[in-house]
Amino acid sequence: MSCFKQDVYNCITPKTLSFVKSFLKQRSNDPAASTHLSSARVVEWNLNGIEVDSRARDELKAAVNILFRIMKYIGQFPFPKLSSKDDSEIISLTVQEFVIASVFISGRYRKLFGNDNGEIIWKFLFIALSHQSDMNFFEDDLDHLFTIPLKYPIEDGDSIAIKAQKVDWGGLEIIKKLSNLDMNQLQLQPSLFLNLTTLFLLTESIPNQKHNKMHDQFVHNLTTWKDFRKYSLDLLRYMNNDLSKDDLNSQTLSWSEFSLGMNNLLAPFVEVNLRKVVENNVLNISLPFFETSANSKMDGTGDEVPNGATTGTKTTMKENEGAGVEAQSKEETKVGNDVESSFGSKLVSISLIAYISSMLRGIGSTIEVTRFNAIKLFAGLEAGFSIRSLENKIYKWHAPTLLFVSGKRIKQRTIDTNRRYQEFDETYPKFFQANEDLLKSWQYTNDRITYCVLINQPWQNSNKKNFGDEKSLILSLEPRADYYTSLHSEILKGQLIYFNNSGMGLGFGNAQPLNKSNNKKYYPGDVSLTIESNLEFAVFRHLGSLSTNATTYFNRSRLPSTVAHEDFEDRFLITDLEVWGIGSKKELEEQQRQWKWEEQQAEARQSVNIRNMGEERAFLEMAGLVGNNGSGGSL
């Protein structure tokens, strides 16, 4: 079938017309009722009256501009055309472009093209971020006739919606061109992608709820943009672990690195949060779409202002009755008490929880972690770095836990002078030769190293036998994202954890350590994390080039780069160690009631001891064992 560009666009939109109507709160089917939306307007809408540091403000602007660049490129499907290469240029979307982009972002395009073309949106995203001005597949000619393939013949009486169902969307020329395109000729700019993933990670921290609450929490979390940015860079290092924060503008990501990174970990994170930003309207993207009428106003930027809103006043979409836009005062948009700024932890934050949540989703874990179902059980900085203290705090929790361990890479001075480290090193088997360089190209002496272990089963005293199941996994959080899942084995059955309170510490992916008289020795697995008994030093080991005699409990890295086949260790001095319980609201309430009861019992016992002290002292004085002056008696 031959038709013009606009006819093709018209065939796409009926498939999602009802969705778009409800989302945009359109009050008319008249195309003249809406106009364009600029990226600058969206940023202004969200930052109005909000105190955010200048760098965060600039990077949010860049992220929204990049988002609009991607949406504009996708929104011109099936005749995509890249806009200007200038990142600072304000990008505007028409309603038609917004609608078509939403078809892809919402995932509804799969109904049109089939699941075989699921990678198409990642190609569009990569091309849009690659800044290749020559990647326009079609002439910009509205009068040119295009041929579109059909599944079924078009009849004269068919409506546009019926015609859309008869089009073979998967057979479009653009799909063929994308399939044959050598994507490796393109290079993605990680500095652009970093701003976008920071926006997505911030969105990840916001649970699905009413729109006004989601937007309030988004605005609140903007104040910690730099924390989200730090973890976003760690996520991007999953694609290329050589990315440096100081030199991002001169670095690139290849299509191979990008596609493997997306497929192995990041695709669910990007897909879910891209949809949340646009479809759930966290950024209020659709609000500045407005009716063109005599009652509309103009603000100082040259954009029109929706009816009912005043210039310089923040607005949010009304949740019920679909009544469009309603003005709210700054007091009404302040974040409520339910928005927590921190967890009372030096290590764990809202941004870190969002980071872990995104990784667990990408791995396919059934365990969900949010700021609402996590409770701190142990913190070394509060309770002391003691194996007994750790044991007392975590053994009463009967749901999954997350163990965080963080510190600084061991330096040569510690190796040469710290006797406690030397004793630990003597009991931990060496793999590398003394003359080998222990640091790989992506490892630096000043690295902050952070690992997180997901323990699905309750903690057990395991001085003789390991415990655990195959849902256990190790997450590398800093300086780069990576993950190590439990190896499926009918023999091991995921029993890969020990908690040894008799002098050998904690092991994840290790065999039981030897601890007899003066003979102590660790047996680390090829992929393992070992924490010595004083909770002072830790070692993560990854042997990827060859198999050793050690039992393998965890799978090796699936990093797209050469890391999967590398032998390396992260040895670090522990500065923070925390354990957090993950459970339902019911489990949290039951655990809190149990802790409260135990505190009351402890206070009662202390009270009894104080009351009985007088009687006990009297007997001791009568026996002459304690003098009246309280300094002891004489015989």
UniProtKB/Swiss-Prot annotation:
GO cellular component terms, A-Z: cytoplasm
UniProt domain TLDc: residue ranges: 346-583
Q: Which InterPro entries match?
A: TLDc_dom (IPR006571)
Cited Pfam families: TLD
Sorted alphabetically, which keywords does the UniProt record give? Answer: Cytoplasm
Main location group: cytoplasm
Membrane-spanning regions, if any?
none
Its subcellular locations are:
Cytoplasm
Q: Region Disordered: start and end of each range? A: 297-333
> SMART domains of this UniProt entry?
TLDc
Name the family the entry cites: Belongs to the RTC5 family.
**So what does this one do?**
May be involved in a process influencing telomere capping.
- Put simply, this protein is called Restriction of telomere capping protein 5
Q: Which organism is it from?
A: Lodderomyces elongisporus (strain ATCC 11503 / CBS 2605 / JCM 1781 / NBRC 1676 / NRRL YB-4239) (Yeast)
Gene name of the encoded protein: RTC5
